[in-house]
UniProtKB/Swiss-Prot annotation:
Catalysed reaction, written as an equation: ATP + H2O = ADP + phosphate + H(+)
Family of the protein in this entry: Belongs to the parvoviruses initiator protein NS1 family.
Protein name (Swiss-Prot/TrEMBL): Initiator protein NS1
Biased segments, Polar residues type: 409-423
EC number per UniProt: 3.1.21.-, 3.6.4.12
Length: 885
């Protein structure tokens, strides 16, 4: 038995794993690395592994005319060298390619007369491109050897491992087969090398279709002895053919078996009686008998050549079998023993290989350059490149243990109707400079610019504009700064269940309603900004930015298991089995029905998320050190968990004096159900891009008084970016060709001047709005995230109680506009980058109308049904108003 890289035969097991251990480890490694390729290009991981091993095998056995190189690209600790060194050890005669640079005149010196050449972390100068093209294509070339004459490098397979792909141009696609691997944490557990015979195992399993009568006898020493014996004969081919025929006759008469492709039905030969096997090698792409004979001879010679050079007993067995087959067919029968049949072509689709290589490279580049916001921990925000566009839909998912949220069609896509405009940029809309001034018109001029209009294309003598990364000179107007901010939070909650309730509600303004409240379905208030940021982060954003806009949010639900009651004394007739599979589910029937939930329940969840029950509720008037306590104001940490109690309400409008009622809500038409007993880890995910995610913006459309309705300016100001020419004056907004007027929209819900502690804490990710000025935009808003149970009853109709532990993980991406000079944009007007298309979302007929007040009622809670308010009793609404005041 060879010792390969071991110090001695006694040290072999200290250096290499056993063959069985190596087989298991290499399968685990390939399962991990082929998983990503399987998701994109193959039907299963087995197909991906088969393609990988086949590609490597065909390169090593020189099966391709032009493609002669196999490359694995990966970051460190991916296992590429761990795997490739095993393959190279199997072939023994391995050469090393050195880097091509001015300091090395003999890069191919060690690559002459080798079975396979290896190049780790390649680096080369452009002058070596033509040489490498020949080397990678298997074309013969000359190599300079130190202190010797030039040598000839024949077609020799090349194996490359690299951390970065240096061969990205199209010229290499026909010469190199590339695979991209990923860091494998489990490699840290392995302290030995893989046994080289693991490569034989992989070939037998994933490449060869040979009919093996018994297990191949792996012994290189015996193979070398047989090789030397055969070399002694002058006519070794004739001797081998005679010996092959003799072995074949013995096998046929002793076992009474028929050897043929696709017809092998005999029992296995006893391994104790024979140590060798006859193997049938099928020929490919032949059209007549003569080509069959020629293909068999060629394959036979390749087997014997392999045996002579590397002592592979498998090759000897294959050569013997093919020699016997050819002798009988050509000289006895005169025709192939098994018929022609249809042989599968091994011609490769190079166009597809190019596409796969490019897709793998693009995916790897995207993975390296685009961070997934779900992987961030507790961060205070991240200032990314101002012009960088972040698209979460393009990011790879590393947590796919469970399916994403599914609807009736099986998938729940990102809300494409909610696509926001591109990330803020100076190129979207130039700063409006021709507007009203205190003289009634004309360009805005600042003396520090040397007489030029602020924000104009040319700067005056006072200084020159820059991109914000250069020195700031006195008097030079600076461009706005756009920052991308990423925040994230994680929460541990529990969900309980109860029966559904109903009632009739007489409202004061919109008629008569019937309501259902599903107490086993609860809403996650992911529309609230404070589910993503802390109070301090929110205040810092309001302090640091002129205006702020939500670009995208992500909310994930992880299941920690459903806890069922432990029944000890009840009978089976009254209580269901405590080990029952309790279903958990996510609902999205808000697509078809008007839904809402109570603002007090939402406030309770937000308080628990912020920790106000222990930070603020019991804080004394004077600073004092208190004793440790387990009794929290809202929950008892020693006995119960943090419940989400936010049942979803469905509203049905009922006409007066009519008895007909609308259809009952089909909640199970819009549900994705999982087994709560076995579902652990990530269960569902929702992503959303707000239509109107503007949190606030400073504006001079308001006075200096912080009131619910600040006094507008007396200056007529055009709304920038609107083609129809809307104008604002003292108390009116009007269109140039329309006499209809109304109170000017002071952007109350999104104006920094009007921020207060109460409405800051009630900020929403998306403010739905309805256009009143003819814009062709469908009213849309943020969908609800509703999770819960399917109720299970006992035989006596009582409810089988359960408690569901969940983790909620949220991430938010915002863009902030920071004006660098007050006279440029900070207090001049609403920044046009936001309001070119979104400004009409704030045009309500009456600015004093309740929907604009953030902290009142539940009418701002998301619904996909336009024109529907929350139906709260008048007394509850008045009580809520008093609390806010």
């Amino acid at each position: 038995m060879p010792i390969w890289g071991a110090i001695s035969s006694n040290d072999l097991l200290n250096t290499y794993y056993t063959i069985e251990e190596s087989q298991q480890i290499v399968e685990e490694l390939l399962d991990f690395q082929m998983h990503n390729d399987q998701l994109e290009y193959f039907d299963s991981i087995e197909d991906a592994k088969k393609r990988f091993i086949t590609d490597l095998y065909e390169i090593l056995e020189k099966k391709h005319q032009k493609t002669n190189t196999f490359q694995i690209v990966s970051p460190p600790s991916a296992g590429k060298n761990f795997f490739i060194e095993t393959v190279l050890a199997f072939y023994w005669n391995t050469g090393v390619i050195q880097n091509f640079n001015r300091y090395n005149n003999f890069p191919l010196m060690e690559a002459v007369n080798r079975r396979v050449n290896y190049w780790d972390e390649p680096n080369f100068e452009p002058d070596a491109t033509e040489t490498l093209k020949k080397l990678f294509a298997g074309t013969s070339l000359k190599a300079t050897v130190k202190f010797q004459k030039e040598a000839n490098v024949q077609k020799t397979p090349v194996i490359i491992t690299a951390n970065y792909d240096k061969f990205t141009k199209e010229v290499w696609d026909d010469r190199i087969i590339k695979y991209y691997w990923y860091p494998c944490p489990k490699l840290k557990e392995y302290n030995k090398r893989l046994h080289p015979f693991a490569w034989v195992y992989l070939i037998d399993k994933y490449v060869t279709d040979l009919l093996i009568l018994i297990k191949m006898y792996n012994h290189r020493v015996m193979g070398n002895k047989i090789c030397n014996l055969i070399k002694m004969y002058k006519y070794r081919v004739m001797v081998i053919n005679i010996f092959s025929a003799f072995i074949c006759l013995i096998l046929i008469f002793l076992t009474n078996n028929y050897l043929g492709p696709g017809l092998y039905t005999c029992k296995s030969i006893d391994e104790t009686t024979l140590s060798e096997a006859v193997v049938i090698w099928p020929s490919d792409k032949v059209t007549n008998h003569k080509e069959v004979f020629q293909a068999d001879k060629q394959a036979r010679d390749e087997f014997f050549t392999s045996f002579v050079h590397i002592g592979n007993v498998h090759s000897l067995i294959g050569g013997i079998g093919l020699g016997t087959k050819n002798l009988v067919e050509e000289h006895v029968l005169g025709k192939p023993l098994y018929g022609m049949g249809k042989r599968k072509s091994t011609e490769k689709d190079w166009a597809k290989i190019k596409r796969i290589n490019r897709a793998r490279a693009a995916r790897r580049e995207n993975q390296e350059n685009q961070p997934d916001i779900r992987e961030f921990g507790h961060v205070a925000g991240q200032n990314i490149n101002a012009d960088q566009e972040v698209n979460l839909a393009d990011f790879p998912d590393f947590l796919q243990d469970f399916d994403a949220e599914a609807g009736p069609s099986g998938t729940q896509p990102v809300e494409t109707a909610q696509q926001s405009p591109p990330t803020m940029s100076e190129d979207i809309q130039p700063m409006e400079t021709v507007g009203a001034t205190d003289t009634g018109g004309g360009a805005q001029v600042d003396p520090r610019t040397g007489g030029q209009a602020a924000g104009g294309s040319e700067m005056g003598a006072g200084g020159s504009a820059n991109d914000g990364r250069e020195d700031i000179f006195s008097g030079a107007p600076q461009p706005n700064q756009h920052h991308t901010l990423v925040y994230g939070k994680s929460y541990h909650f529990t969900i309980t269940k109860w029966f559904t309730e109903f009632r009739h509600l007489a409202t004061t303004n919109s008629g008569y309603y019937a309501q259902q409240r599903f107490k086993h379905i609860h809403g996650i208030p992911w529309e609230r900004l404070l589910m993503y940021v802390s109070e301090g982060e929110l205040l810092r954003m309001f302090r640091d930015y002129t205006s702020l806009k939500v670009e995208e949010v992500v909310c994930e639900v992880y299941s920690l298991g459903v806890r069922l009651p432990f029944v000890t004394s009840a009978t089976t007739s009254s209580v269901a089995n405590a080990n029952a599979q309790y279903p958990i589910d996510v609902f999205h029937f808000d697509e078809a029905y008007e839904t809402n939930y109570g603002i007090n329940n939402v406030a309770d969840i937000i308080n628990k998320a912020l920790g106000t029950e222990w930070k603020n509720a019991t804080r004394p008037t004077a600073p004092v050190t208190t004793a440790w306590s387990e009794q929290f104001p809202n929950i008892s940490a020693s006995s119960t968990s943090r419940d989400i109690n936010n049942p979803v309400i469905v509203d049905y409008s009922l006409p007066y004096f009519e008895n007909n009622v609308p259809k009952d809500v089909g909640i199970y038409d819009y549900v994705d159900i999982k087994n709560g007993t076995t579902a652990y880890g990530k269960c569902w995910e929702k992503r959303f891009k707000p239509t109107n995610g503007l949190l606030y913006a400073e504006s001079t459309l308001k006075g200096n008084v912080v009131t619910p309705l600040a006094a507008p300016t007396n200056i007529m100001t055009p709304i920038p970016g609107l083609e129809n020419g809307y104008f604002m004056s003292n108390d009116q907004i009007r269109e140039r060709r329309d006499l209809t007027t109304s109170v000017p929209p002071d952007a109350l819900t999104a104006t920094k001047l009007n921020q207060s502690a109460s409405n800051n804490l009630n900020a929403f990710v998306d403010y739905m709005g309805y256009n009143y000025f003819g814009e062709q935009k469908a009213p849309q808003s943020m969908p609800k995230f509703m999770i819960g149970f399917v109720n299970i009853r006992n035989e006596d109709n009582s409810l089988l109680n359960a408690k569901w532990d969940i983790l909620i993980k949220t991430r938010i991406r915002l863009t902030g506009l920071q004006s660098t000079r007050e006279w440029v944009a900070r207090t001049d007007r609403i920044p046009p980058q936001y309001f070119t298309s979104q400004y009409t979302q704030f045009r309500y007929p009456n600015i004093n109308d309740t929907p604009l007040l953030r902290s009142l009622g539940t009418f701002k809670l998301p619904t996909k049904r336009p024109g529907m308010d929350s139906r709260i009793a008048l007394g509850e609404l008045q009580k809520q108003r008093k609390m806010n005041l």
